[in-house]
Amino acid sequence: MARAKLKFRLHRTAIVLICLALLVLLMQGASYFSLSHQLARSEQVEELAQTLAKQVAFSLSPIMDSGDDNIDSQKVDAILQQLTQSSRILDASVYQIDGTLVASAGENVKVRDRLALDGKRPGSYFNHQIVEMIAGNSGPSGFLRMTLDTHVLATESKQVDNTTNLLRLMILVALAVGIILARTLLQGRRSRWQQSPYLLTANIPVKEEDESEDDTPEALVGQAETDHKPADK
């Protein structure tokens, strides 16, 4: 009896541990889902920024293809100012094919500091550099460089955390509903699985569904014989 009781406890403990492990995996899966969604969104933003750089380079192509002495730097500066005004683009610069700076707009930060080549700007890993060639009639006429701010704002980070917490809460609510339904539907009932040799109730017979004794064949036959008996005089 003691050995069977010990086996039953070990069996129940193993089931509980497996359920807890699955619950932890579901929680981590919710975090992974939110993180993958955030990474996919970052890739989408990078693709959109690359498309924007190509469009700006296409707009600068007629200006840059007019020759080194005839480049209208004011038009280039106006385009860059419009590009960097109240946006995630921190700065933008246009260079000639030999590296000469034509115009720049945005934050007044040196390229070496922006790229953290000297290690003086620890927050530069939140910046993403985009370089796009400006095509001309006879070949490249210059280059466009943009600095994209990839830092996640506090509101965006909080939104991701709220999504993760909501998924975890839904998992816990589903678990609680399952436990309540199981206890409500199985409370006071014993089924065939309780005849398992690992349970202490293995030797106790299982009662069948509640049936009225009047519905048994013997009761029906007895009732029929009673109905056919002659009445006592």
Swiss-Prot record:
A Pfam family matched by this chain, by name? SMP_2
Keyword Signal in annotation: yes
Q: Where are the transmembrane segments?
A: 166-186
Q: Where is this region: Disordered?
A: 204-233
The leader peptide range reads: 1-33
- Chief subcellular site? membrane
Q: Does the keyword Transmembrane apply?
A: yes
Keyword field:
Cell membrane, Membrane, Signal, Transmembrane, Transmembrane helix
Q: Which InterPro entries match?
A: Uncharacterised_Smp (IPR019305)
Quote a single Gene Ontology cellular component term: plasma membrane
UniProt lists compositionally biased (Acidic residues) regions at: 208-217
**How does this protein sit in the membrane?**
Single-pass membrane protein
**Location in the cell:** Cell membrane
Query: Which domain of life does the UniProt lineage start with?
Result: Bacteria
Describe the family membership recorded for this protein in Swiss-Prot or TrEMBL: Belongs to the Smp family.
What protein is this chain from?
Protein Smp
